[in-house]
Amino acid sequence: MGSITASFILITMQILFFCEDSSGEPNFAERNFWHASCSARGVYIDGSMITTLFFYASLLGVCVALISLAYHACFRLFTRSVLRSTW
């Protein structure tokens, strides 16, 4: 757990303090995370409509899969406890 926290802090520090401007030079004057030079490379925040639909469809699929796995696990535990109980 400690190595995950250390890695997270290291990555956050790199994002916040080593942003580059358009010329490729480190921009220490603007250490604002929301500055355009600090945005992720190759990942657009405002995507097209198809990208948005694909994202939400994927998110819905993951949610349905997690809910079905949780339901299956609870149903299996309930069935096992009912079969072991004596009436």
Curated annotation (Swiss-Prot):
Domain of life: Viruses
Topology versus the membrane: Single-pass type I membrane protein
Compartments where found: Virion membrane; Host membrane; Host Golgi apparatus, Host trans-Golgi network
UniProt signal peptide: 1-24
InterPro entries (UniProt xref): GN_domain, HSV_GN
Transmembrane segments: 49-69
Virion surface side: 25-48
Membership in a protein family: Belongs to the herpesviridae glycoprotein N family.
Name of the featured protein: Envelope glycoprotein N
Annotated source species: Varicella-zoster virus (strain Dumas)
Organism taxonomic ancestry: Viruses, Duplodnaviria, Heunggongvirae, Peploviricota, Herviviricetes
Gene it is expressed from: gN
